[in-house]
Amino acid sequence: MKKIFILIFCLISFQSTALEKKTTFSQEVFNKAQSEGKIVVVSSWIKYCSSCASQMKVLNKAKDDFQNIIYLNFDVGNEEISKLLNVQYQTTLLIFKKNKEIYRSVGETSKSKIYRAIEKSISNNLSISINSNASIGS
């Protein structure tokens, strides 16, 4: 029983650490970043989601490695933002550039795949788009 308690405590601690650097989604911040021509990475999460914590850990590292990008996230339970961004699942990762969604994935936690998507968005290669029909803040 003691081992189970310790395991649960460790898992909760890991999730808290992974989510500690999050920047909550704000329409104002999003629109300002887009108007300034910045790339915006948006991720959705939900409390007690281990894949969300894994994805957030990768994104926290990306914040250090790709500093000219705006990173935002939101709780997928926020219906207003979920509807605005057409997000139905936690760990949905979106990349926006020039007011267009240029990348979308669900459940991606691989550092190499997430970094590749960010690098392609920086290099103006918009062919990584899975759903480029979304336009926010125009």
Where are these regions (language model features)?
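Sec-dependent N-terminal signal peptides
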Residues: 4-13
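N-terminal leader/targeting and pre-domain segments
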Residues: 10, 17-36, 119-138
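Short active-site neighborhood of thiol/selenol oxidoreductases, capturing the structured segment around
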Residues: 35-47
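Thiol-based oxidoreductase modules, predominantly thioredoxin-like and allied folds used
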Residues: 44, 67-80
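Solvent-exposed loop/turn segments at secondary-structure junctions
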Residues: 46-50, 77-80, 92, 101, ...
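Typically the conserved alpha-helix immediately C-terminal to a functionally engaged Cys/Sec
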Residues: 51-65
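Structural micro-motif
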Residues: 85-94
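Non-catalytic, surface beta->alpha helical segment in thiol-disulfide oxidoreductase systems
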Residues: 97-135
